């Protein structure tokens, strides 16, 4: 994996937020996978959980300030993913989600090298 020249505190905050979300939205004792993939001009860091999943119609909205998926029982402000997006984009990167109801979620950040 290539070296990344980033604000380590901000990117650590993003990864911690993604991990915290995965833990809070997963069944007790389920596994969470964290990994990194080298691409030609970027490094992808991802967090995969096996929780409830997110309806695809909310995939864009979850990155907006104060948005919370309807019916979510986990406490939160609706700011974590919006702040994560701001931090990642400030580094010239992107953040995204792949998820289906009942199949968990995979959040990834792509940072240029």
Language-model regions: role of each:
Residues 29-41:
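Short beta-strand/loop element within the Bergerat-fold HATPase_c
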Residues 3-6:
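Conserved micro-motifs of the catalytic ATP-binding
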Residues 80, 84:
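Short alpha-helical Gxxx[C/S/T] motif in the catalytic ATP-binding
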Residues 53-61:
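Short helix N-cap motif at coil->helix boundaries in the Bergerat
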């Amino acid at each position: 994996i290539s070296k990344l020249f980033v604000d380590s505190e901000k990117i650590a905050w993003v990864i911690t937020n993604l991990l915290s979300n995965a833990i809070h939205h997963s069944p007790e004792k389920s596994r969470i996978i964290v990994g990194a993939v080298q691409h030609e001009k970027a490094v992808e860091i991802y967090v995969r959980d096996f929780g409830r999943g997110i309806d695809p119609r909310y995939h864009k909205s979850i990155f907006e300030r104060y948005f919370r998926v309807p019916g979510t029982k986990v406490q939160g402000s609706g700011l974590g993913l919006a702040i994560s997006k701001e931090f990642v984009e400030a580094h010239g990167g992107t953040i995204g989600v792949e998820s289906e109801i009942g199949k968990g979620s995979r959040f990834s950040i792509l940072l240029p090298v």
